[in-house]
Amino acid sequence: MPVVYVNIFLAFIVSLVGLLIYRSHLMSSLLCLEGMMLSLFVMLTVTVLNNHFTLANMAPIILLVFAACEAALGLSLLVMVSNTYGTDYVQNLNLLQC
C-alpha cells in the first residue's frame, strides 16, 4: 500500500478517534466529521485518478456535495442550539423536540 493511502487512512482514523473522544461539544463533532469527509474525498479522488476509472469521475464531486449539505445542516443545528440554550453541548440536542 503506497504511503499516500496510508497517510489519508491515518487522517481518517484520527478524525474518527477525535469524534469519539470529543463528542460533548457539537462544534468539535462537526469539525471531526468534516475531517473525515475531507479524507474520504481525497482518498476517492486519488483512487479514481490512479486507476483511471472514467465512469467514476463524478463520484468525488458528489461526495463533496453531500459533505457541503452535511456541513450546512450541522451549522444550522449548531446555531439553533446555541441560540436556544447558550451552549453547544450535544446533550442539549435531546431537548430540541419540535
UniProtKB/Swiss-Prot annotation:
EC numbers, comma separated: 7.1.1.2
Coiled coil (residue ranges): none
Cystines in this chain: none
UniProt xrefs under InterPro entries: NADH_UbQ_OxRdtase_chain4L/K, NUOK/Mnh_C1-like
GO aspect biological process, one term: ATP synthesis coupled electron transport
Compartment(s): Mitochondrion inner membrane
Main location as per UniProt: mitochondrion
Sequence similarity: Belongs to the complex I subunit 4L family.
The protein, known as: NADH-ubiquinone oxidoreductase chain 4L
Organism field: Ursus maritimus
